[in-house]
Amino acid sequence: WSSDVCSSDLGVDGTDGILSLLRDLDEETLVLCLFSGGGSALLPAPADGLTLADKQATTQQLLACGATIDEVNAVRKHLSRIKGGLLARHAYPARTVALALSDVIGDPLDTIASGPTHPDSTTFAYCMELVDRYGLRQSLPAPVLQRLEAGVKGEIPETPKKNDPCFSRATTHVIGNNSLSIAAAEKTA
């Protein structure tokens, strides 16, 4: 099961390729994205000072202690260069349109694929609350703990929030979800 929610080196290479395509875009550029369930694991871009192994160990520890996928994704966003609205920030000032296939109940846009083009409602402080709630302070990789603590102190910028200018040029649309899938199955059955 963990291979479905943990990332690989191929994902890092692919994500680096995406980020390189987003360099030096202008207002006339349209960035079209498609996200779906599993997108969080497929877009691993460890933040500066972190390795993929750091992120994998953190994800595995969170899952092993019973953290929800929303909690795991909150931490992932703060250990990433692309999640939690950061893809939209990298693409800015280009116009970004994301189409999402949601496997998340309620279709929260900041949760689908860890919300790479949507404002992040979580914070470094919340991530540290999770670390303490699940008793992971002693077992997480040191660079992960250092990054989260630095974020709480304001030494590292937060993930972009709803007032960030990049979101004036970014939209996300759910084009498929569990309800639509069930309705289609009922119609064809």
Question: Which sequence ranges carry the predicted segments?
Answer:
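Short, small-residue-biased leader/transition segments that mark boundaries at the very start
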Residues: 1-7
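Structural motif
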Residues: 23, 29-34, 40-41, 67-70, ...
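Accessory alpha-helical/coil subdomains and C-terminal extensions
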Residues: 94-97, 119-189
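A glycine/threonine-rich phosphate-anchoring loop and its flanking beta-alpha core
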Residues: 63, 69-137, 144-149
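Active-site glycine-rich loop that binds ribose-phosphate moieties when present
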Residues: 13-20, 53-57, 80-85
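Hydrophobic alpha-helical hairpins/lids featuring a short glycine-rich hinge
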Residues: 8-49
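Short, acidic/small-residue loops that bind anionic groups at enzyme active sites
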Residues: 48-73
